[in-house]
Amino acid sequence: MKLSFGEKVRNLREDKDLNQTQLANKINMTQRKISYIECGKCEPSIDDIISFCKFFKVSSDYLIGLKEIKE
């Protein structure tokens, strides 16, 4: 089963034992935006994708669904 962008972000966040507010503070994003991205109500911007990739140390290809391996 292929995970959505938001599901991957949620899994990565939970792997680091962070709540949405903690992640928001670390990547300079609002908690509401993270919530909307995780549940699929909002598409991330390029800058958002870059922020998630840098913080979680994963490739953009993984997050956007081009590869199934985090790398």
Place the predicted regions along the sequence by residue:
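DNA major-groove recognition helix of helix-turn-helix/homeodomain DNA-binding modules
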Residues: N28, D47-Y62
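Short, charged recognition helix plus adjacent turn
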Residues: D15, K54, Y62-E71
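Residues in the helix-turn-helix
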Residues: K33, E43, Y62
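A short, Lys/Arg-rich alpha-helix, primarily the initiator
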Residues: M1-D15
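Short alpha-helical DNA-recognition segment
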Residues: D17-Y36
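Residue-level signal for the short linker/turn that defines the boundary of a DNA-recognition helix
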Residues: E7, D17-L18, P44-D47
